[in-house]
Amino acid sequence: WRRSGDRDARKGPARAGAGDGGEAIFQAEFSHAGTLTVVSDRSGWWNLYQLRDRGAVPVCPRAEEFGGPQWVFGLSRDAFVSGGTMLCAHGVGGQSRLGRLDLQTGALEDLQLPYTSFDGLRVEGQRACFVGAGPVRPSAVVALDLGTNRCRELRLGSTLEFDPSHLVVPQAFEFESVDGRRSHAW
C-alpha cells in the first residue's frame, strides 16, 4: 500500500501499488528521486518495477530473475547508486551477473566480474559491497569500486587453496517436465 503525495507517504489516500491479486513483491525501496521501486513476479519472472501515478511500470523487462528465493533472509539483489542508476543482480539458471541499470532508459550494462552469485548487495558513495562467489571461487565479502569496476576481496569464506583446473564448472540446463513446464537443473 502507498499514499500519493510526498515520499514519507503522509498525504493522499492509501491505495495498493503492487502485490495484490496473487502478485508477490519484495525489496521495496525509494530511489534517490523518491520513486518507489519493487521487484515483482507479475510477469512470471522477478523483474524490477517503479510505482508511478499510472501504476507499476517495468524498468527493465526481461525473461530473467532480478529476485531470488524468498526463504533467504536479508536478501538484497539491488541497490541505488546515484541519480537514476542502480546496481542489480540478474540472471537465469542459477547464474547471475551484476549490472548497472539506468532507471530512465532501462539500459542494463553488465559488469565483467569473476562471480556468478551476488548476495547482500549494498552501496555507499562510490563503493558497493556484496558476498560474491563463483564455480571456482569460494564465497567472499567483496568491495567494488564503482568508478573503476575493480573488486577487492575483503574476507574469504575459505582459505583452502586448490587448483581450479581440477574442478568441473557446472552447466545449467532446462528440460521439459510435467504438463509441458520447464525445469532447471545443473
Task: Go through the PLM ranges and name each one.
Residues 1-186:
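Peripheral, non-catalytic segments that deliver or gate enzyme domains
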